A protein has these predicted regions:
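An amphipathic, aromatic/His-enriched active-site/gating alpha helix that lines ligand/cofactor pockets
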Residues: 58-85
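Short, flexible active-site loop motifs that bind/organize anionic cofactors or intermediates
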Residues: 8, 55, 69
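Short amphipathic alpha-helical patches
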Residues: 29, 52, 77-79, 88-89
Length: 90
């Protein structure tokens, strides 16, 4: 399944708000999968110095990732398909 990143700018976000957004995203992904639209939140990284977040999703399409984030009320700047590379792959 393709891997996507949802890039976000989250000025002033608190740790509690980040956790709440994660709970909503996880719930919405599970609901969409149950409805037949496979989307799974893999992990997120928050960059405090730039107030940016990169959230990774396995999904059938970019639109599925956008819909999951919209349902979860988690804003995003853009969703981009990525190619994963790990040290074990090289």
């Amino acid at each position: 399944m393709p891997l996507f990143v949802a890039k976000r700018t989250l000025p002033g976000i608190t740790p509690a708000a980040l956790m709440s957004a994660g709970v909503r995203a996880k719930t919405c992904c599970a609901e969409m999968t149950q409805e037949g639209e496979s989307v799974r939140w893999v992990r997120s990284f928050f960059l405090p110095s730039t107030e940016q977040s990169h959230c990774y999703f396995d999904a059938a399409s970019k639109l599925a990732v956008e819909e999951a984030n919209q349902r979860a009320r988690v804003p995003f700047d853009e969703v981009i398909e990525v190619i994963e590379m790990t040290p074990d792959m090289v």
